[in-house]
């Protein structure tokens, strides 16, 4: 069977603060795109805090702190073999974000 890892529809469930009104979701065509989206959220926050900076750089620990600071974060990833979405927690998201950023840093996408 073909490897569907790159084309696994991914839904990110996100809650910024303890208020239930901050619950939202984002959907992506792949896990990699979802990780780009999460990194993008953090990068936008950094730009809001530091509007005069042209280039934003950060350490993986900073991204982990951002992820841990969210009231809730989880992912639903489509599994073609069972035709259903499987849930994943923030630890899984942190692991995937790390591998995604490492791949980008090494020049591969």
Swiss-Prot record:
Keywords: Cell cycle
Subunit structure, as described in the record: Homodimer.
Family: Belongs to the E(R) family.
UniProt key word Cell cycle: yes
Function: May have a role in the cell cycle.
Protein name: Enhancer of rudimentary homolog
